């Protein structure tokens, strides 16, 4: 059955949003909602938050506070452009956006939408979790509350967001210049991640890694920090032995399951391969057995 066409409201003043959201549903890029509506989901009234994007920059940097503020209602393309145009440095998030879906989807999808769907496979969330993000939420009375991202994520399709609330921005401590993101999916574009990894660290003059933070998606009910593996790497040179120990420690941080996209066994093997590649990028001198990320043909084994 085709859902009834919704009434669309598009405020341009943040002060109007809370009033309009009474009995309505917030929408930004709508990339997830469109899929839900094809499955019959009703949404009689939608409040389009993208009208708020013109009132502020996509990314702002507060050097005094050492903090980046990222809009939750701008398209991902605008966020990536803001990060590469000098508004801030966030290599892991920039890389995640570059690998997110397709150009068309990136021109519509938003950080806010990617957060509130509560998907453990969401591609922007590992970078934000690794960076220690805080979520700014507007309450129905127009007030503001802030929640750590780790506490915002409650489970598959569940987040700490009450009726009438909406996400306005995400704030992160200024990330280091060294960071990245890798994902494994069924193809290079328009693919949900079988699993993904974001990382960031400082590299000291002697080569030791400090401030190591890792986060992985699709290996637990929510995106999770790899705290045990990060502790192994902290203040260490990423030698072969240290990397082997960090890779072995991943099992303590993840709890993947078998599902339609991949088996738990496949995900554990890919998790090890992704972290190894982040720490020791493949080179022409690598041993033949050093990189063991399995092929997608093995995903159901």
How should these model regions be labeled?
Residues 1-301:
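C-terminal structural segment of proteins
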């Amino acid at each position: 059955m085709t859902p009834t066409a919704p009434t669309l409201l598009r405020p341009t003043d943040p002060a109007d949003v809370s009033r309009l959201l009474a009995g309505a549903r917030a929408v930004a890029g709508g990339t997830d909602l469109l899929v839900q509506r094809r499955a019959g989901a009703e949404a009689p009234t939608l409040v389009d938050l993208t009208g708020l994007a013109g009132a502020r920059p996509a990314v702002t940097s507060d050097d005094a506070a050492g903090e980046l503020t990222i809009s939750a209602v701008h398209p991902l393309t605008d966020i990536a452009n803001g990060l590469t145009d000098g508004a801030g440095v966030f290599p892991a998030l920039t890389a995640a956006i570059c690998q997110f879906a397709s150009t068309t989807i990136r021109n519509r999808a938003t950080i806010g939408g990617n957060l509130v769907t509560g998907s453990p496979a969401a591609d922007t969330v590992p970078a934000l979790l690794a960076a220690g993000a805080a979520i700014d939420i507007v309450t129905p009375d127009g007030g503001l509350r802030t929640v750590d991202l780790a506490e915002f994520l409650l489970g598959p399709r569940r987040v700490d967001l009450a009726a009438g609330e909406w996400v306005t921005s995400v704030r992160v401590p200024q990330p280091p210049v060294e960071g990245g993101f890798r994902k494994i999916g069924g193809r290079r574009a328009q693919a949900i991640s079988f699993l993904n990894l974001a990382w960031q660290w400082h590299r000291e003059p002697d080569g030791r890694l400090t401030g190591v933070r890792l986060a992985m998606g699709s290996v637990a009910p929510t995106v999770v920090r790899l705290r045990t593996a990060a502790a192994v790497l902290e203040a260490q040179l990423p030698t072969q032995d240290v990397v082997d120990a960090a890779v072995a420690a991943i099992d303590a941080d993840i709890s993947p399951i078998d599902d339609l996209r991949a088996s738990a066994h496949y995900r554990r093997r890919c998790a090890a391969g992704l972290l190894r590649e982040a720490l020791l990028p493949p080179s022409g001198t690598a041993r033949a057995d050093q990189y063991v990320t399995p092929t997608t043909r093995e995903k159901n084994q």
